[in-house]
């Protein structure tokens, strides 16, 4: 969902380059993210991080890991940045990239990422837009490059069509998963993902008793 532009967003982004990293600089940091964080802790990436609540909650809960939220909309990135700055002390394990997730290998080197999160991605329901879906083959090829061996991807969506398309796409790509790593109603099967952190959309859909589809696949 595209947010209404906020006049303060771009100035805020410009004022906080240590937290919010713009596209060109992020590309220059490819392969060097450990130096950005000052350690070699596992690096987790959310593609399409929106207003940032999910990636922020992860960074708070898991200080032993590093987290990056990749988002195209400046207003969304700025809102996420404001949330991060409200944390005391400041989160040293969180960065935001203002950039396009069309090819994540532009930003990350081979085997640089431990896990990728896709949360409530645009389903792009029209057949002519298939290649824009974040679980299409062209995206999976990029993910397979940047993920560590046996690195994982977690997908959560309320859109059954996108979920079933993703399952088919994963299988065609040669991926498989055990029964305990897939759910057609996650909130009633939390034993499969007991450390689940809800997204903003997920909370809304749960209140409407709408099922949350979830899968974790290893590359």
UniProtKB/Swiss-Prot annotation:
SUPFAM superfamilies: S-adenosyl-L-methionine-dependent methyltransferases
Domain of life: Bacteria
The protein's annotated pathway: tRNA modification; N(7)-methylguanine-tRNA biosynthesis
A GO term from the CC aspect: tRNA methyltransferase complex
Record: active site: 122
InterPro entries: SAM-dependent_MTases_sf, tRNA_(Gua-N-7)_MeTrfase_Trmb, tRNA_methyltr_TrmB_bact
Residues that hold substrate according to the record: 126, 158, 199-202
PROSITE patterns in the record: SAM_MT_TRMB
Region Interaction with RNA, annotated ranges: 128-133
Catalytic activity line of the entry: guanosine(46) in tRNA + S-adenosyl-L-methionine = N(7)-methylguanosine(46) in tRNA + S-adenosyl-L-homocysteine
Residues reported in the UniProt entry to bind S-adenosyl-L-methionine: 46, 71, 100, 122
Family from the record: Belongs to the class I-like SAM-binding methyltransferase superfamily. TrmB family.
Record's function text: Catalyzes the formation of N(7)-methylguanine at position 46 (m7G46) in tRNA.
PANTHER family: 3-DEOXY-D-MANNO-OCTULOSONIC-ACID TRANSFERASE/TRNA GUANINE-N 7 - -METHYLTRANSFERASE, PENTACOTRIPEPTIDE-REPEAT REGION OF PRORP DOMAIN-CONTAINING PROTEIN
UniProt name for this protein: tRNA (guanine-N(7)-)-methyltransferase
Native organism: Oenococcus oeni (strain ATCC BAA-331 / PSU-1)
